[in-house]
Amino acid sequence: MAKDNSTVRCFQGLLIFGNVIIGCCGIALTAECIFFVSDQHSLYPLLEATDNDDIYGAAWIGIFVGICLFCLSVLGIVGIMKSSRKILLAYFILMFIVYAFEVASCITAATQQDFFTPNLFLKQMLERYQNNSPPNNDDQWKNNGVTKTWDRLMLQDNCCGVNGPSDWQKYTSAFRTENNDADYPWPRQCCVMNNLKEPLNLEACKLGVPGFYHNQGCYELISGPMNRHAWGVAWFGFAILCWTFWVLLGTMFYWSRIEY
């Protein structure tokens, strides 16, 4: 392929542009996944206690893939500008490996969206919240994490339980085993607080008087951020894969026309 041909130059420009987009997407993917694994909403203890934190695994893969895509886009641009078959061959091999990792990340993140159900967090809350009799240290660690996370959620976001305060009444729980029903119909964090973070009217809260306890559940506050992150990791990654596929296809065609 003659390198001074204007058509070839135009095609090279398109491929370089395609790789620039891949590099920018790689940086964006890395930033998105770093934001996710930094756990801005402090919800990781709830996932850890389910023994299924694959969505975080998908995000860590996304960080690796994003960095690799940026580096490989630079390699691809150099190979295209120099019309080097060896550089482009290395680009293809490495890109296919990274592509496979990103496919795995997208599939993992997409399938996790159906995992965040109300029953999952309800069962976990009932079993682990204020459970002081775990079978081992690992469960104690998880119970403490779940308890602290729920205390913060209910106090900070003015909610109570997964579906509402009735969760603490309708179901058997470790909390109910540890506390008297009359004194603790639900955790103190479910009460409306004053500026000192003390119940505004404890007796009214215990009796369930409207305005003195929170009757909204916390499920949306838990599943919302998790689903958004899972959606972002999965579908932004999928969009990158689609774009990369066509850039790779065009680069392979260009590589096949380079003279030895």
UniProtKB/Swiss-Prot annotation:
Family of this protein:
Belongs to the tetraspanin (TM4SF) family.
Question: Where is it chiefly localized?
Answer: membrane
PTM (free text): N-glycosylated with high-mannose oligosaccharides.
Q: What does this protein do?
A: Component of the asymmetric unit membrane (AUM); a highly specialized biomembrane elaborated by terminally differentiated urothelial cells. May play an important role in normal bladder epithelial physiology, possibly in regulating membrane permeability of superficial umbrella cells or in stabilizing the apical membrane through AUM/cytoskeletal interactions.
Q: Which residues lie on this side of the membrane: Extracellular?
A: 37-60, 108-229
Q: What is this protein called?
A: Uroplakin-1b
GO BP annotations listed: epithelial cell differentiation; response to bacterium
Transmembrane residues, as ranges?
Answer: 16-36, 61-81, 87-107, 230-250
User: What CDD domains does the record point to?
Assistant: uroplakin_I_like_LEL
Ranges per topology, Cytoplasmic: 1-15, 82-86, 251-260
GO CC terms, sorted: apical plasma membrane urothelial plaque; extracellular exosome; membrane
Record bears the keyword Transmembrane: yes
UniProt keyword Glycoprotein present: yes
Q: Which domain of life is it from?
A: Eukaryota
What tissues harbor this protein?
A: Bladder epithelium.
* Cellular localisation: Membrane
Q: According to Swiss-Prot or TrEMBL, what is its membrane topology?
A: Multi-pass membrane protein
Pfam families recorded for this chain?
Answer: Tetraspanin (PF00335)
Q: What is the lineage of its organism?
A: Eukaryota, Metazoa, Chordata, Craniata, Vertebrata
Q: How does it assemble?
A: Heterodimer with uroplakin-3A (UPK3A) or uroplakin-3B (UPK3B).
GO molecular function terms attached to this record = structural molecule activity
Keywords, alphabetical: Glycoprotein, Membrane, Transmembrane, Transmembrane helix
